[in-house]
Amino acid sequence: MTALFSSARLAGSVAAIALFIAPACADAAQETAQDSAPEPQAQTTAGTTAGTAAPGSDIVASAPDSAWRTVSAERLMLIETTNGEVLIETAPEFAPAHVARFRELAEEDFFDFKVWHRVIDGFMAQGGGALDNPNANADKPALEGEFTIRRDASMTITELQDRTINPRENRSRARAGFWNGFQAATQPIAQAAIRADGQVESWLLHCEGAVAAARTQDPNSARSQFYITRAETPHLETTYTVWGKVRDGQEAVNALEEGALAQDRNFSPDFIEDVVLVETLPAEDQPTVEVMDTSSDAFAAYLDAVAQADGGTLPNVCDIDVPVRIQEPAQ
């Protein structure tokens, strides 16, 4: 079989021109995120296919330890919901102020028994509002948007496919691929040579499981509300700050009761029971999370298998599951 994606190709990089649009987030009719002891069990996720092995599952199962990146506890947050736990890896490299804010709020127990006050099928689940006030926010300064970053060649983002930056402004295209196990997009790093600062713009994508900050029409208004996407939402690209990614528990997000508290006072939303910084848990209670290194030979082989199963062409980068291994703590 001809290898479609060599490790050399995976070493490429990419990013995009920051767009700005301000959707009318206060209008609930618009689809934008708005403000207002047994042995430990290991599990590996790499996508499933209706009772059959997912493409590349054999490669994932046999990948050497060197092909996996262990996620430090400092990067992990655990959201406890009425439907189960959601494990999130944060991305301070892309949104340092937002990650710091949500860590601070978790330490202050701000989210305890807040609600998922706006949950839309095929879109996202927004949380952080109060049962009696869906527009509630923490008494914190508003954050400046961290929609994109500027980077040089020392930060690698793989270039796998072309992508429209934002379909609402179909005027520019970028390249899409992976950074550190996150789906990302970027201007081609080759363009850095013609930039005064030697850098290009890059951002994390709104694929399913993206964790981002909710805001009003003001791009610099995020405070404490957040949302988790339940599907790919490309119309939000580069206009909302993505600060994390669900590594386990997306099914709990997708099972949340749907509705909008601001529009239907009879809606009974699910609760956020707690948000925990994994590093604050006793060592014996911390899960071990490993994400396949998306610059490794094993991931290149995995991509090749995924492409071969799809007629020789990679699917949309948002439809490619990044393999994750989780070692749960002993109960």
Residue ranges of model-derived segments:
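C-terminal motif of bacterial Sec signal peptides marking the signal peptidase cleavage site
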Residues: 22-24
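Bacterial N-terminal signal peptides that target proteins for export
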Residues: 2-14
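Cyclophilin-like peptidyl-prolyl cis-trans isomerases
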Residues: 26-331
